[in-house]
Amino acid sequence: MSNAGGTAGAARGTSRRTVGILCAIGASLAWGFGSTTSDYVLSAGVGNDTFLVIELSIGFLVLLALGAIRGELSGFRHPGLLRASSTGIIEPWGAYTLGNVGIIFSSGAFVALVSSLNPVLIAILAAPYLGERVSRRAAILMVVSIIGVALVVGGAGAAGTLKPEGIIFAILGLFCGAAYVLISSKLVRTMPVLPLVASQLLVAALASLALLIVRVTIFNGELQLPATEMQWAVSVATGVFGGAAPFILYLEATRRIPTTTVSQFSTLVPVIALIGGVVFLNDVTTPVQLLGTAIVVVSLSLLARYARAH
């Protein structure tokens, strides 16, 4: 009986880790696809703050509907949720806004490269904050995957002008992203994921709306709404893939496998964005980018295998 019980326990542990890995991969897929749709909408001339209001509001409404279907609305009365929802200022609002401003002063490739350092920052801070340590093998795979990302985002050649402001905003966005992951990973140990993420999206949407109102009323800016049905459809889709889905999946993953491991799968995001650009935006890849893609995929495959066993 003891052997049978031990075997069953090991199987449950493996299954739990497998689900965590799948959630981490799913979050990266959603963020990558969301990057592609965001690129399409913003390139069409939709205002950044306007787009964030639409995207984050849709994400909130989707999670609210999902919570109603799953009977989880009672979770919105969880003690401490109101205070915890303020982390939405850090991300999505802070990280997304700072990243977009960073792109204005530098380039999307540079901001993506800086963002790929997120697993490194989390690995450093997770030890004192979450009590997690990265194994030697996982650390090696993390470095290899980041090298792959560097090839993916830099393989098309340098683009844009790198200014000090771009560096500052990109780094601030990086710290916002890492802070959100560490704080939220700890929060979901004691509160339900769906109400937490929905509340964070709502706070971020309201912050974006406040900026939009200031820009339009005080600085006489234009609303810059989506101009066509396609732009509206893609904006709404981004609310699902860039707002609701990735945060839910990411935090669900941290409940099953170490946060330091989950963060490493985020290096898959630029790869998915690259593929999405080729498929939907007619972007052209280079051999260097394809090599980087292969490196990221192989390193993350090895990481998934290692995480499933440990």
What are these regions (language model features)?
Residues 1-54, 159-186, 206-211:
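Glycine-/small-residue-enriched transmembrane alpha-helix faces in small-molecule transporters
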Residues 28, 53-54, 96, 111-119, ...:
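Helix-helix packing/entry segments at the starts of transmembrane helices
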Residues 30, 34-35, 64-115, 151, ...:
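Specific transmembrane alpha-helical segments of multi-pass solute transporters/efflux pumps
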Residues 32, 36, 88-93, 97, ...:
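Hydrophobic/small/kink-forming positions within alpha-helical transmembrane segments
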Residues 41, 51, 55, 102, ...:
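Hydrophobic/aromatic residues within transmembrane alpha-helices
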Residues 50-61, 90-91, 99-133, 138-142, ...:
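Specific alpha-helical transmembrane segments that line the substrate/conduction pathway
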Residues 63, 125, 134-156, 208, ...:
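Hydrophobic transmembrane alpha-helices of multi-pass small-molecule transport proteins
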